[in-house]
């Protein structure tokens, strides 16, 4: 091959490759890309035609020019494959855009289909809000506690009935002989608070508690809220005012008569149980009137031994505490007869006793219709 023919051949090959690559880049779909492939690499394609001319060349020319043509063929083949992947991705994006599925839940059109807030959740929020308005913080702790925090630091002596296996859920003893248990009250949270904070202290401690008991008014797991105030001047008058204001707000009455009876708890001295005045009308209880009394909580001044065991000097500080069952006051306020119904998960029951998310429950209209 003369120099002139070789130059023309190379110019034609470079121009051909550039044109083919431009056509590949401009192909807008698989069909257009396939047409370019046939035009370039098909049996009658332009590059195939160049390969056919190799037979007319000398062995040396065939070796040299054949390598150049094959290089151009490989370049075009790789460009075709790359463009094909791009077109596949574009096609997939277009299909996904046209087949978009709305995965958000459909709007419930009727109130009957709406979810309900469980009465216990509702009362938990009510209680927390009322005490928060009085300046109380919320303290929480673990459900699994040590015997030390659950009993010993709360002035329970060894051999106290509450420590017995038939009343408390114990875990197997640890290697050092200490025992873990499911807390029987939320008082261990008070212990943790006194050990970690310096007075003054003003907290409530809501949470789950556990005792080995099950009947119409008891379940193995139940909910409590306890309160604790520690400072230098707190006294029973402050405790009575707090409980009186809470009962007025929670039971939605302008006034409620309360009766404080002497009692005994290892962790308070003096200890008191609190009753509120009410009137029973068949299945309804009205608070703030009548001649009946209902026990709702226990309370008292924190025992000096508890303060000592929690690192607080009883010669400087004093305080009071109280505890009530969230399940019990839920039953009293909203007319629930059987405690076990709170935990059975009956959708029909929850539809009646539950609350819609945006409604404000009241004694008069608190229950869902």
From Swiss-Prot:
One of its GO terms (biological process) is phenylalanyl-tRNA aminoacylation. Its EC number is 6.1.1.20. Keywords: Aminoacyl-tRNA synthetase, ATP-binding, Cytoplasm, Ligase, Magnesium, Metal-binding, Nucleotide-binding, Protein biosynthesis. Binds 2 magnesium ions per tetramer. Its main location: cytoplasm. InterPro entries: aa-tRNA-synth_II, aa-tRNA-synth_II/BPL/LPL, Phe-tRNA-synth_IIc_asu, Phe-tRNA_ligase_II_N, Phe_tRNA_ligase_alpha1_bac, Phenylalanyl-tRNA_Synthase, tRNA-bd_arm. It is found in: Cytoplasm. Mg(2+) binds at residue 269. This is Phenylalanine--tRNA ligase alpha subunit. The gene is pheS.
């Amino acid at each position: 091959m003369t120099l002139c023919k070789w130059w023309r051949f190379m110019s034609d090959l470079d121009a051909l490759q550039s044109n083919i690559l431009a056509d590949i880049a401009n192909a807008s779909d698989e069909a257009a890309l396939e047409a370019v492939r046939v035009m370039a690499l098909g049996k009658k394609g332009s590059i195939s035609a160049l390969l056919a001319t190799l037979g007319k060349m000398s062995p040396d020319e065939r070796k040299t020019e054949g390598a150049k043509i094959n290089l151009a063929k490989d370049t075009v083949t790789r460009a075709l494959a790359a463009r094909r992947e791009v077109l596949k991705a574009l096609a997939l994006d277009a299909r996904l855009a046209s087949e978009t599925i709305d995965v958000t839940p459909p709007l419930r059109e009727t109130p009957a289909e709406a979810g309900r807030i469980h009465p216990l959740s509702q009362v938990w929020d009510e209680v927390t809000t009322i005490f928060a308005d009085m300046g109380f913080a919320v303290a929480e702790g673990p459900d699994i506690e040590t015997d030390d925090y659950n009993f010993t630091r709360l002035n329970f002596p060894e051999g106290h009935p509450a420590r017995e296996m038939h009343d408390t859920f114990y875990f197997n003893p640890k290697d050092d002989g200490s025992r873990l248990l499911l807390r029987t009250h939320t008082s261990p949270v008070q212990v943790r608070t006194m050990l970690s904070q310096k007075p003054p202290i003003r907290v409530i401690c809501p949470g789950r508690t556990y005792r080995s008991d099950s009947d119409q008014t008891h379940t193995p797991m139940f909910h409590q809220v306890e309160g604790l105030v520690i400072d230098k001047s707190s006294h029973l008058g402050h405790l009575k005012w707090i409980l009186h204001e809470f009962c007025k707000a929670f039971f939605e009455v302008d006034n409620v008569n309360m009766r404080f009876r002497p009692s005994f708890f290892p962790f308070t001295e003096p200890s008191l149980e609190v009753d509120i005045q009410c009137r029973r009308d068949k299945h309804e209880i009205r608070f703030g009137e009548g001649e009946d009394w209902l026990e709702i909580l226990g309370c008292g001044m924190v025992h000096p031994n508890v303060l000592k065991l929690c690192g607080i000097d009883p010669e400087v500080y004093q305080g009071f505490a109280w505890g009530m069952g969230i399940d019990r006051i839920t039953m009293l306020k909203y007319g629930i007869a059987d405690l076990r119904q709170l935990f059975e998960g009956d959708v029909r029951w929850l539809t009646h006793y539950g609350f819609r998310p945006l409604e404000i429950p009241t004694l008069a209209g608190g229950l869902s219709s």
